[in-house]
């Protein structure tokens, strides 16, 4: 028989630099992209009997909401931020669209080499990968990758950093809109 999707992965283009005259810095999502996301999310939710499928989103440049989430002392913070986040200067509303649609449980970005944290904001985990290449102009974290494990039928996931030498750090569980460190994790 035909199988239905159990989860969604959104791989999106957050662009590179601003294309708006007079606004410097990094790019952001366009309204067309946000509309595309909302349409896909609504279609999958409708096909699933009105219940949003659990989803993860991946793109390069952090959303502006990362900054406030990391700096909020009431949030649980797991990982490191050895530099400031570098989102685009304008906030087009992609995070609001994800909160309203109800499917995305985690957003993972890169771009900033010295950040690898995970923090929850409005029921969505906001996380960074880990710098995985060789030396660049800056990278104070050890090279590694962020791994994610989804469990079918659950609206959550586990994630951790696997460093190049095999060391596992910051094993995190995301359930019910909250992150927590898994016991026996560095």
Describe every region a protein language model picked out:
Residues 1-4, 94-96, 115-186:
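Binuclear metal-dependent phosphoesterase catalytic core
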Residues 6-16, 58, 124-131:
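Active-site-proximal beta-strand elements of phosphoester/diester hydrolases
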Residues 8-11, 23-116:
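His/acidic metal-ligating clusters that form di-metal
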Residues 15-17, 61-64, 131-134, 153:
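Short, solvent-exposed loop/turn segments at secondary-structure junctions
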Residues 19-20, 72, 176:
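Serine/threonine-rich low-complexity intrinsically disordered regions
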Residues 22-25, 138-140:
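Short, solvent-exposed loop/turn segments at secondary-structure boundaries
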């Amino acid at each position: 028989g035909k199988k239905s999707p159990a989860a969604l992965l959104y791989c999106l283009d957050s662009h590179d630099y601003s294309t708006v005259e007079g606004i410097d810095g990094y790019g952001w999502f366009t309204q067309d992209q946000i509309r595309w996301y909302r349409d896909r999310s609504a279609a999958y939710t409708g096909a699933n009997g009105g219940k949003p499928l659990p989803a993860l989103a991946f793109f390069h440049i952090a959303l502006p909401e990362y900054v406030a989430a990391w700096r909020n002392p009431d949030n649980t913070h797991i990982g490191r931020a050895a530099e400031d986040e570098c989102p685009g200067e304008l906030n087009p509303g992609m995070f609001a669209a994800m909160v309203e649609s109800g499917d995305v449980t985690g957003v993972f970005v890169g771009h900033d080499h010295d950040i690898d944290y995970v923090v929850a904001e409005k029921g969505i985990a906001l996380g960074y990968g880990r710098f995985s290449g060789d030396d660049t102009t800056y990278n104070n974290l050890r090279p590694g990758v962020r791994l994610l494990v989804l469990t079918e039928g659950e609206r959550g996931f586990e994630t951790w950093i696997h460093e190049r030498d095999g060391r596992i750090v910051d094993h995190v569980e995301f359930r019910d809109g909250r992150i927590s460190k898994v016991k026996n994790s560095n």
